[in-house]
Amino acid sequence: NLVQFSYLIQCANHGRRPTRHYMDYGCYCGWGGSGTPVDELDRCCKIHDDCYSDAEKKGCSPKMSAYDYYCGENGPYCRNIKKKCLRFVCDCDVEAAFCFAKAPYNNANWNIDTKKRCQ
C-alpha cells in the first residue's frame, strides 16, 4: 500500500531523501500522470504507475494492499508472501523504491507546471 511504499523508498535510499520529495516530481510522481517523463526518476514513477495499473487489471487493490516486507542492509525486500496480488504489489513497490534510489534527483523537476511540461 502507499504507506508501506513510502517506507520502502526510505529503506532503499537509506533515508537520504524524504518521501515527500517524490510526491510532486515530474509528470508521474504523485497522483496521476501524463505525457513524457522528464527524466530517469520520473520514468521510475511511470513504471510504478504502470505496474499498479497491471495489478488493478489482475483484480488487485495496490493502493490498499498490505504485505510483509523487510528493510535490510541492502534495502527492502518482500517476505514470504503467498497471495499473488500481495506479491505482485510488493514487487512493484520494491522495484520502484530501488529505481528511485538509483535515479538522480533534479530539483528543477519538483513541483513543475504539468500543464505546460507534461503534454
UniProtKB/Swiss-Prot annotation:
Coiled coil: none
Superkingdom of source: Eukaryota
Cofactor dependency: Ca(2+)
Cofactor, free-text remark: Binds 1 Ca(2+) ion.
Catalysed conversion reaction: a 1,2-diacyl-sn-glycero-3-phosphocholine + H2O = a 1-acyl-sn-glycero-3-phosphocholine + a fatty acid + H(+)
Binding site for Ca(2+): Y28, G30, G32, D49
Gene3D superfamilies membership: Phospholipase A2 domain (1.20.90.10)
Active site (record annotation): H48, D93
Gene Ontology molecular function, alphabetical: calcium ion binding; calcium-dependent phospholipase A2 activity; phospholipid binding; toxin activity
Pfam families xref list: Phospholip_A2_1 (PF00068)
Disulfide feature: C11-C71, C27-C118, C29-C45, C44-C99, C51-C92, C60-C85, C78-C90
EC number(s) per entry: 3.1.1.4
Major enzyme class: hydrolase
InterPro entries: PLipase_A2 (IPR001211), PLipase_A2_Asp_AS (IPR033112), PLipase_A2_dom (IPR016090), PLipase_A2_dom_sf (IPR036444), PLipase_A2_His_AS (IPR033113)
Cellular location(s): Secreted
Family the entry assigns: Belongs to the phospholipase A2 family. Group I subfamily. D49 sub-subfamily.
Protein name (record): Basic phospholipase A2 notechis II-5
Source organism of this protein record: Notechis scutatus scutatus (Mainland tiger snake)
Lineage, highest ranks first: Eukaryota, Metazoa, Chordata, Craniata, Vertebrata
